[in-house]
Regions:
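Beta-strand elements of repeat-based all-beta scaffolds
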Residues: 1-169
Length: 169
């Protein structure tokens, strides 16, 4: 825009840039492995390092300040656990993700053991979201936001836990 162009440099036989220089002179360098996965991103703020598993999913990210984020996956490639830097450093629990038989996330458990539970119909539409506090008290029967759909799959009504109703047309 307005004549400003970024300069991109490529290595031989690489589809991705190895270096980008912005119009303001800010430089970012990228490192790749032999199969083309990005392993590092470097600029004046530091270097971010990435690690992958055998299925090419990012499993580790170390930022410019040395903090590590970890991700774990099941055999189907679904994210099962995410550890932000604080939880990983202190060896505390991270975020857990539970999936249904169609590999959709149906429950997210935070490090504080809060459940963000979602129920879906056969079409994949969300029919209810259980509030974390209500889930702790009543489990699957807890209060939350409910959704109703017409025969075409359009959300026509949202029922809130306080009794409020939102209609959609």
């Amino acid at each position: 825009a307005l004549g400003n162009e970024s300069l991109k440099e490529y290595e031989a036989n690489r589809a991705y840039p190895s270096r980008v220089i912005t119009p303001k002179g800010e430089e970012t360098a990228y490192g790749y492995d032999t199969v083309g996965r990005r392993l590092s991103i470097s600029n004046t703020y530091g270097t971010v390092e990435l690690a992958y598993n055998s299925r090419n999913f990012v499993t580790s990210r170390i930022d410019g300040e040395g903090y590590t984020t970890r991700r774990f996956y099941d055999r189907m490639g679904n994210l099962t656990t995410y550890y932000p830097p604080v939880q990983w450093e202190k060896k505390e629990s991270g975020y857990e993700y539970r999936h249904d038989f169609l590999e959709r996330v149906v429950d997210t458990i935070s490090p504080l053991q809060e459940h963000h539970r979602v129920f879906r119909n056969f079409d994949g539409d969300i029919t209810s979201r259980i509030h974390p506090v209500s889930y702790a008290l009543k489990g699957e029967e807890g209060e939350g936001t409910r959704y109703e759909y017409d025969s075409d799959g359009n959300c026509i009504r949202i029922l809130y836990p306080d009794g409020g109703v939102e209609r959609r047309f």
